Amino acid sequence: PRANVRFNPTKDINLRMSYSSGFRAPQAFDEDLHITAVGGDVAIIQISPDLKEENSQSVSASVDFYHRFGPVQVNFLVEGFYTDLRNVFILEEIGRDEDNNLLMERRNGKGARVMGINLEGKMAYSWMQIQAGATLQRSRYKEAEQWSENPNITPQKKMFRSPDVYGYFTSTFTPVKRFSASLTGTYTGSMLVNH
């Protein structure tokens, strides 16, 4: 289920609040197979017989500001979000088979929390449009998860392949009617990748 509330205290400001909940059915994911194959290892992923569905509860709130300054139209968005995951899916090494293939098992972890803030800005002028955004987030398991059978590798609370910072920008310039140029970019912050 999902519930949304929107309120406009002025013509230039939108306030939004949202709540949602959902689940993911037990399964092994294609990206797990692809990522392991890229690392040069063949992995056989099995689903734990005790695997339960993953559940989530999410809330978010945002302030959206729209205004025109003469010929320039601007928009700024500030959004906060929080998601609580229960029975979060984790992937753990459980050994190797007789052909030396890596054996991994999809299990339930204790849970995880994802929270952060999203900032976006847009500006439009007659011949130019610029948009940029950044997300600062924290994705952590509630308890450190042991992801490898190697005793020298410490368990991690930080979620894998989940950067704390990422962002983007896009821009389009049309100085004359028959010519348009675009410039875009993305930034992905550092992250942990299990291997």
Feature map (PLM): residue ranges:
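Signature of Gram-negative outer-membrane beta-barrel scaffolds
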Residues: 1-13, 25, 36-39, 131-133, ...
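Hydrophobic, lipid-facing positions within transmembrane beta-strands of outer-membrane proteins
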Residues: 1-5, 47-49, 57-61, 76, ...
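Membrane-embedded beta-barrel scaffold of Gram-negative outer-membrane proteins
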Residues: 8, 16, 50-107, 113
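Surface-exposed loop/turn segments flanking beta-strands in extracellular/periplasmic regions
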Residues: 35-47, 92-108, 151-154
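Gram-negative outer-membrane beta-barrel transporters
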Residues: 73-85, 89, 101-195
